[in-house]
Amino acid sequence: MTEIVEIFTDGACRGNPGPGGWGALLCYQGREKTLSGAESKTTNNRMELMAAIRALETLKRPCRVHLTTDSQYLRQGITCWLSNWKRRGWKTANRQPVKNIDLWQRLDQVAAQHRIEWFWVRGHEGHPGNERADALARSAITNGEEK
């Protein structure tokens, strides 16, 4: 587990809820792989989660990963909130059910297979990996398919 897989993810939605898409760019040893998908009625947060989940599910073995997102919801959720949610039986600090629990549980399971560092960048600020993931997510909404 010495080589690092760089992953850039983004989610997009036209309306919230509305048609949504997600995109991911994976970079490893000079090679790139792009992934994207869409749902007809979803939220931006669900698309952010799906981008990370599908990117991590694509990895064929345990890896060191640097995952970069422009979603504070995703980064804060996985690095800060998740352990508390699990300890409380998947309830928030206000004792409410965690939103998007199906995706958080799926992300928790797939993330446990890897050694991941989570990074946040401000969206639409010209970060090349984030811009490509954003373009994939927006294109997926228009094309409505998984690639």
UniProtKB/Swiss-Prot annotation:
Cofactor info, note text: Binds 1 Mg(2+) ion per subunit. May bind a second metal ion at a regulatory site, or after substrate binding.
Binding locations of Mg(2+) 2: 10, 134
Assembly mode: Monomer.
Keyword Oxidoreductase applies: no
Signal peptide: none
Entry's Gene Ontology molecular function annotations: magnesium ion binding; nucleic acid binding; RNA-DNA hybrid ribonuclease activity
Family from the record: Belongs to the RNase H family.
HAMAP family in UniProt: RNase_H
UniProt: Mg(2+) 1 binding residues: 10, 48, 70
Catalytic activity: Endonucleolytic cleavage to 5'-phosphomonoester
EC nos: 3.1.26.4
Gene responsible for this protein: rnhA
Protein name per its UniProtKB record: Ribonuclease H
Role of this protein: Endonuclease that specifically degrades the RNA of RNA-DNA hybrids.
Cofactor: Mg(2+)
GO CC term (a single one): cytoplasm
NCBIfam families linked to this entry: PRK00203.1 (NF001236)
InterPro entries assigned to the protein according to its UniProt record, in alphabetical order: RNase_H, RNaseH-like_sf, RNaseH_domain, RNaseH_sf, RNaseHI
Subcellular location: Cytoplasm
Gene Ontology BP term (one): DNA replication, removal of RNA primer
Coiled-coil annotated spans: none
Limits of the RNase H type-1 domain: 1-142
Primary site of residence: cytoplasm
